[in-house]
């Protein structure tokens, strides 16, 4: 069997991404981690988010995952670099911020978009940085 794609979130919200992957990539196997022990991530410091996300990334890479999806806005906004460091250069790491911004800009090119997010996501400023690229 081929190596799985690892997905993690602070709870079960990332299951929507897992469902989309199953629909689009039906032959791929998935390894899902919902970190309910530390949820919610939205009220955690960037340092704590880096710690949690790095630990999960280590678990997923040790399980042989060929790619990682950080399906949590708070973790994607604050800990994507830490996850990439743990995963190493051979394991692609995908967060949710850039795909969301790309979708929003392609579907609403002239619109004003608002973000409703956790404190950790909003305070990271990542959506502002990505939309001004």
Where do the model's predicted regions map?
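Non-catalytic structural scaffold of enzyme domains
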Residues: 1-133
């Amino acid at each position: 069997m081929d190596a799985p794609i690892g997905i993690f979130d602070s709870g079960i919200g990332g299951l929507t991404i897992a469902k989309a992957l199953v629909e689009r990539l039906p032959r791929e196997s998935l390894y899902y981690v919902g970190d309910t022990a530390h949820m919610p991530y939205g009220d955690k410091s960037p340092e704590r988010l880096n710690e949690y996300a790095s630990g999960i990334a280590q678990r997923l890479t040790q399980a042989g995952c060929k790619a990682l999806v950080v399906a949590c806005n708070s973790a994607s906004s604050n800990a994507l670099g830490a996850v990439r460091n743990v995963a190493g250069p051979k394991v692609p790491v995908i967060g949710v911020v850039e795909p969301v911004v790309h979708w929003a800009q392609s579907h609403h090119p002239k619109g004003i978009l608002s973000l409703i997010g956790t404190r950790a996501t909003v305070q990271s400023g990542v959506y502002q940085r990505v939309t001004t690229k």
